[in-house]
Each structure stands twice: as structure tokens, then as C-alpha cells.
């Protein structure tokens, strides 16, 4: 059955569309009275928005997760986060392996593309490592968080909250249950808690660097020279973005949102902002009061997002890195684009440029429409749309105030951000075979 669907739809289209059944089932379950603390039906649009946000591991919400949803509803959201983080095809493959069902070549190729692997050999082993590694990291995170949550909340509630937030952080989802302290407060209660901050940050970063990078590090340990070019670019770019982002927030918010904190607290909160604005959606400070510089820095980091083959969305670290490397290569007057003693093929540069243009166009267009419909300021709306496109989930507090039309636009942005801009074009576009005769070239003026 699956093999026939793959053959008919193609790998990219099948992987992208595999999120839709999860979203629809989640929407139905969240609509039910059993999911709502009021015991009433939740309207379809808000249930769909929550389902899309959870499955696309974003974290934008129209209701406070603790205040509105029952434990049943919260678990439905958590399952969608886990499926969205791993990918439905990874889950299906693991079930097939567990049931000892034969996985044919077409399904293996599909899994290769879904997991981000470059070779079909070893794809099933990689899938096992992905699932095993995910549960190990989430388990370690839950145990560590339990040491803080259990004394504060009691044993059962502490364990439940530890598991929920560990999974949400590792999958870069940003959903939280801290509304019992104050609705929509996220992790602001723990703003000066170094222990919780470091654990959440670590889970977000590990989940956001990608499964291929894990596998490469596991295989080659800490021998950087032996890593794949992909791994080298991801690690270096991630490190630069974390440090630069943290430094930026430290400077821009020193006398702003971080003014009442000690220097060590400022550093930790600035680093947390640098981590979470790229992929996760948690916040330890009030984002509605960010300075203009801090808001602009957040927009940039949100659009960049995490790394390919990870639980994160956005443009991806490698996309930005390739374009930056290409710019420097062009400035030097060279024809080849080289880095780490390897040459990057021109097709990758073209695809990277296309992806950036797609994201920028989508964010600008959707922001203009929402501004027109809602009458809100551009800064707030840009923040929201960039958060949706990067599947980040941080907000300046307008998500629950906007109309159904604007929610639909944000849902499209979240879905596109999760599967990738180029994949979205390939899903709904019709690829035509190349013409047998190439047209003559002609120069045009640019720049």
C-alpha cells in the first residue's frame, strides 16, 4: 500500500503529505469535549491550528496549553509533537522493523530522503539510531528536569511535567504546561534558574543539529577532520549563530528586558534567547517588551532556524552557510566555491538562493495580508509570521487575538516551514521534463 503511494506521488510529495493525516486526526481528537477542561467542543479552526502547530513542532498557540486542554488533550498534543519531530515515516518504519515486516527498496529510498541520509545502505540502521537516540536524549532530559520539578510539584506531576517539557524541548516544539503559574508564561518562572535553562537549551540544540550529524559524531567520535562536510558546516554555523546571537541579545537587552538581572543571569538568558529563537519557542523573558534591535535579531534567527534532517524548521543553517560561502568566493574572484578542502556544487548554491527567496517572499506576503486584515503593527506581525515560517513558536502575544483568515495563513506558514520551502514548491508544482533543445544565452545587467 505505502509502496504504491510512494510510486504514485513521488518521495518528496509523499513525505510532505504524510503530515496531513496526523494533523487531521489530531484536530478531531482536540475538538472532542474530553480534550477541553470546559467539557465543551473546541471549535475546528482553533483545534486545527493547535494540531498544525504541534505536528509541525512550532509552538504557536491560541489557548494556554495547561489552562484549556485536559490531560487527554495535552497527551494528544505531545504525541503529535513526537510524531512531528521524528517524522511519520520514521515511526512507520520502526513499527515495520518491530513487526519484522519486509521493507522494499522503494520504501528504503523514501526513508533515506526522509532521514536526510545520502546513501541507501545503512538507512534502516540510521532509523534505529534516530529513534533510539531520540528516546535516550529525551529520557535523560526528563530525569534531569525531574530533580527540579518533583520537589516543586510533587512526584507524579513532576514526572509528567519533566517528560512533557523534555520531549517538547528536544523536538524543538516549545509547548509548555507552565500556565498553572500564569497563562502563557512559558518558562519565565525559571528565568534565573541556571539548571533548568541549561537542560532545556541542551535538548533544543541536540534536537536541532540533525540526525545525520549525530550519526557522524557517533561514528567518528571527536575527530573533526573525519566528519562529513555537512556535519562540519552544521557544527561551525550553529556555534557561530549561538555565540553571535547570545552576544547580540546581551548587548541589545542589557538595559532592557535583562536590566534587573546580574551579569551571569544576563548571559544565561541571552544565550537562552539565542537558542530558543532559532528553533524552539520557549521564553524566559517577556518578548512583547523586546527592544527593536532585539526584535530584529530574533527575526533573523527565527528565519534561519535549525539544521537539515532535524526536528527544527526554517531556512536551515546549511542554506545560509552555503550562500555566505558563495558570496565570499565571488568576492575573491574564484569560480569554485570551496570550504573545508571540499568544493560545493553550483546546484546547491542555486537551491539555497531559491529557498531564501521563497521564505522571504512568503514571510513578506503573509505579513502584508495579516496586517491588512487585522490592523496590527508590522513589527508584531512580522515576528509572528517569521516564528511560523521558522517553526519557532515564540510570539508577542497576538496569536489568540487574530481572525480565522490570519490563522489559516500562519498554518500554511508552519506547514511550509516544517517540510521546507523547496519541498512545498515541489509538492504542489508540476515538474516538466527538460526541453531537448537549449535556448541561446544572452547577458543582462544586474546589481
Feature names for model-found ranges:
Residues 1-447:
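Membrane-proximal intracellular helices of multi-pass ion channels
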Amino acid at each position: 500500500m505505502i509502496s504504491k503511494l510512494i510510486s504514485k506521488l513521488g518521495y518528496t510529495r509523499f513525505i510532505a503529505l504524510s503530515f496531513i493525516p496526523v494533523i487531521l486526526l489530531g484536530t478531531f481528537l482536540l475538538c472532542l469535549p474530553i480534550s477541553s477542561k470546559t467539557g465543551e467542543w473546541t471549535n475546528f479552526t482553533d483545534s486545527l491550528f493547535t494540531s498544525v502547530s504541534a505536528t509541525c513542532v512550532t509552538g504557536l498557540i491560541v489557548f494556554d496549553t495547561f489552562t484549556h486542554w485536559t490531560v487527554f488533550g495535552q497527551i494528544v498534543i505531545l504525541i503529535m509533537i513526537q510524531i512531528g519531530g521524528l517524522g511519520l515515516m520514521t515511526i512507520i518504519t520502526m513499527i515495520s522493523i518491530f513487526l519484522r515486516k519486509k521493507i522494499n527498496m522503494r520504501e528504503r529510498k523514501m526513508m533515506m530522503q526522509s532521514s536526510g541520509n545520502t546513501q541507501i545502505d545503512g538507512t534502516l540502521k540510521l532509523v534505529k539510531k534516530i529513534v533510539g537516540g531520540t528516546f535516550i536524549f529525551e529520557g535523560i532530559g526528563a530525569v534531569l528536569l525531574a530533580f527540579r520539578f518533583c520537589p516543586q510539584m510533587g512526584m507524579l506531576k513532576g514526572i509528567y511535567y519533566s517528560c512533557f517539557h523534555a520531549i517538547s524541548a528536544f523536538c524543538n516544539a516549545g509547548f509548555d504546561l507552565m500556565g498553572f503559574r500564569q497563562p502563557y508564561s512559558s518558562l519565565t518562572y525559571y528565568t534565573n534558574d541556571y539548571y533548568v535553562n541549561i537542560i532545556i537549551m541542551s535538548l533544543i540544540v541536540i534536537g536541532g543539529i540533525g540526525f545525520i550529524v549525530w550519526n557522524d559524531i557517533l561514528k567518528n567520535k571527536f575527530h573533526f577532520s573525519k566528519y562529513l562536510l555537512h556535519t562540519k558546516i552544521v557544527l561551525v554555523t550553529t556555534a557561530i549563530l549561538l555565540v553571535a546571537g547570545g552576544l547580540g541579545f546581551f548587548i541589545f537587552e542589557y538595559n532592557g528586558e535583562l536590566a534587573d538581572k546580574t551579569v551571569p543571569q544576563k548571559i544565561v538568558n541571552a544565550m537562552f534567547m539565542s537558542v530558543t529563537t532559532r528553533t524552539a519557542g520557549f521564553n524566559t523573558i517577556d518578548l512583547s517588551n523586546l527592544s527593536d534591535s532585539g526584535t530584529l535579531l530574533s527575526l533573523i534567527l527565527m528565519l534561519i532556524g535549525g539544521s537539515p534532517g532535524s526536528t527544527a524548521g526554517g531556512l536551515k543553517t546549511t542554506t545560509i552557510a552555503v550562500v555566505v560561502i558563495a558570496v565570499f568566493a565571488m568576492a575573491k574572484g574564484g569560480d569554485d566555491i570551496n570550504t573545508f578542502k571540499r568544493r560545493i556544487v553550483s546546484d546547491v548554491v542555486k537551491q539555497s538562493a531559491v529557498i531564501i527567496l521563497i521564505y522571504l517572499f512568503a514571510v513578506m506576503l503573509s505579513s502584508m495580508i495579516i496586517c491588512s486584515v487585522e490592523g496590527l503593527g508590522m513589527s508584531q506581525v512580522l515576528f509572528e509570521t517569521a516564528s511560523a515560517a521558522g517553526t519557532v513558536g515564540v510570539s508577542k502575544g497576538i496569536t489568540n487575538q487574530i481572525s480565522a483568515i490570519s490563522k489559516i495563513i500562519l498554518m500554511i506558514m508552519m506547514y511550509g516551514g516544517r517540510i521546507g520551502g523547496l519541498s512545498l514548491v515541489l509538492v504542489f508544482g508540476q515538474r516538466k521534463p527538460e526541453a531537448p533543445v537549449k535556448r541561446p544565452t544572452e547577458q543582462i545587467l544586474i546589481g
